């Protein structure tokens, strides 16, 4: 890979199971192509032998094949980002995210950093989320409030050792959870990364990274468990770039939509049509 831009890119895991995560990664790739002015390359980690539609191939920078986990809960490979990324500088994303604005300034600000996690999230109204409803384990164990849905890292020796510790926790999570108060019932990527960070680093994690987190109980409304059953939303492309309004609030930050049925064939077609306009 040649050129400055090739040294920076996005990475996501899209291992299909109950849901079509590769399709979500395709939509994510389109949202990056339509929103990012400089760095818009997305590499995708998929199940071995996964058949990728031709139109997806044109938008994925790299396709990285890994073994399919036995469990339907496809997070077991989330420790592997460090070894699998093709980039010198990587922003890791959950594949159920959308971008509407350019984040080139983020990349610039991250140039003198080596590892940064999102620690603050907002709801669809743009208000900072303070609820710990989904974060009892973090609160009970004084873990750093890290979110792996969007984080950045460089290839460094210290980070290599950190990711080795993350791997150890992933592979022995039930034993590690015995050391925690109020542990989750299942393996949590956020908990594993936060626990490793607490052990390995002596630092604060506050920074500017931010995304809109659409878990229903984090909004300023009394919603159904599936937020998209309570809140109206619609896409527009008046300026030849997609925009999303949720309950008439324009979405500015990376949008972690969570609900897989939020992505319909109509949304895919909307993005494909918009991409053709560029």
Please identify what each model-predicted range represents.
Residues 65, 74-127:
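GT-A fold catalytic core of metal-dependent nucleotide-sugar glycosyltransferases
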Residues 1-23:
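N-proximal low-complexity "stem/linker" segments adjacent to membrane-targeting elements
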Residues 47-85:
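Active-site-proximal specificity loops/subdomain of glycosyltransferases
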Residues 22, 75, 79, 186-193:
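Conserved glycosyltransferase catalytic-site signature
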